[in-house]
Amino acid sequence: MSFNRPPNGVYYIRSAVELRAFVNLLKKFKGYATTLITLYINAERPIPDVVNLLRSEWSTAANIKDKTTRTHVQDTLERIINNLKGEAKAPENGMAVFAGFHMINQGNYEWVYYVVIPPQPINTFKYICDTAFHTELLEDQLHAGVVYGIVVIERGEAVIALLKGGQWEVVKSVEFFVPGKHHAGGQSANRFKRQTEHLAEAFYKMVAEEANKIFLQIPTLKGIIVAGPGPTKEDFLEEGGLDYRLKDKILAIVPACCANEYGVMEAIRNAQEQLKESEYVKAKEVMDKVMYYAVKKSEYLVYGRERALKALEMGIADIIVIAEELGEDAVLEVIMKAEEKGIKVEVVPRGVEESKTLMQAFGGYVALLSTPVWVLEQQLSIAEAAQR
């Protein structure tokens, strides 16, 4: 089967969204018998050692009885060796090589060679010959992305949420009766105050227990945001008994209106600086920039597929912004063309509010330009005139 794909080459993948699109592409390729080679090289593995191993595999492949399989495997190994020769070591995050002859149909083959530099380190060395490429180690990076914990707490109510990739969700709500302040005087007031403090402390311990249970099970937990109105959040940290390992991960204590979904959104907004590695916050920052250009620098912005890709083709785009919702083919098309021109791409993940804005207001494509839009308009007019 034949399909559109990026040209063979080296691809530096910067985000989980781009990685997801590339993984889905790699899964489409099929080899004749076990002729597709997957090679994962961690940064610590010397490339000369890898080349020696591949030469040994080339010699072993000479014993394969089927001529097509033997030819494809040896040819693929030879090409990988030639590309790796002269290199001393892999990049800091390692590299994944996917190479071989994709079977379009019986007797009709297409050479495929991709080197993927992933956003997170490859920690092992693997060499695999199979009928398909093995993407498991790359997929592990998708599942093991950075996770942030969020606790929003007010008097008698709390929510615990997780922020992962481009999405967040409330995973636990806690409610407990804690009376309001009592204004009467005397002994009864003092007794009431002590009872209220006791109930508040019991509530904080309940919330801490739930937070400990949830957060300690997440090995990729990057940090925790604690939020809420007034001093309740500080009282919770002081009296609740949050596990010391989690206390060490607290990135920020920020104000938030209330212990519900609106409070979670406000907590994320108020802790943007601490959450800057999150896809959710990155998407918001990208779309904030797009909206700034749309309002203040509209002469340096174009949108829609045709105009954005034309700006990319002409090399006058500083940044291309595309919605993941458009599909992997569209995303890979932009990544491929931008790689050739050295232009930065920002992929807004599906599921975030900013993706809806990008799709509905801009058709899923935006180009932020290095030159005024009239330069692009002039080129489009010339192209239209030439077609008449």
UniProtKB/Swiss-Prot annotation:
It is found in: Cytoplasm. GO terms for cellular component: cytosol; translation release factor complex. Its main location: cytoplasm. It holds the Pfam family eRF1_1. The keyword Amino-acid biosynthesis does not apply. Coiled coil: none annotated. Keywords: Cytoplasm, Protein biosynthesis. One of its GO terms (molecular function) is sequence-specific mRNA binding. SUPFAM superfamilies: L30e-like, N-terminal domain of eukaryotic peptide chain release factor subunit 1, ERF1, Translational machinery components. Heterodimer of two subunits, one of which binds GTP. Belongs to the eukaryotic release factor 1 family. Directs the termination of nascent peptide synthesis (translation) in response to the termination codons UAA, UAG and UGA. This is Peptide chain release factor subunit 1. The gene is prf1.
